[in-house]
Amino acid sequence: EGEVLVDLLRDSMLIFWPEEINKHFALEPQNYTTPAFDGKHAANEFTSQEELMAFLKKMNAASGTMHLYSAGTTPNYKYDLPLALFTTSEIPANATLAEAAKIVKGNGKLNVWYQAQIHPNEPAAGEGALVMIDNFVNDPAYKALLDKINIVIVPRINPDGSYLFSRATYDGFDMNRDHMSLKAAELAQLHTAYRLFMSEVVLDTHEFTFYGAYNDDWTSAGEYMENADDLETTPATSLNNN
């Protein structure tokens, strides 16, 4: 009874999102062109690292505002940590990430940092980041945002763990508890890249676990947040998070 009461209290804290956010949670079918939704995958398959890199290179070639970099490589499988920078500022073709960051920091616009899939078994975050990249390449409404912001999108923080479809790194380490000590090489490289931009807005995307909806009398053991719309905010990530 105690657990059900806690969940009921949590669910009773209604959150009213503005229409700009609510429209993204519509029930109408959505069509995406990212690798996992190309019609060639089984319903339980997600974008592989090879598909992710091919998709990013394709998007980069099609866009005049996207600049594709690597924030580093993973310790085990030596996968790239891809980083997509979107800006209307002129970035020389041979510019390093540090040089590109210096340019965008000097253009007076708000800097946004969007990272995904630190927990690889939360694939909606990573797939959503690829949709976001597609939008900034092909959707006029998204491209218009670049008149006001620069945005960095890191679609997959933990490629080794994504290959294994685990919550942790290859070594079994939860990087979401490592933002201060930076023991994981992947996260240390990510923070090095972040410090180049020092973005004013940071989005760290995850995916809620779904255990099943409640029965009509609210007595099931499920944990369904009926009104949260999969959007949650937290002030920080530190060593004492549990």
Where are the regions a protein language model picked out?
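M14 metallocarboxypeptidase catalytic domain recognition
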Residues: E1-N242
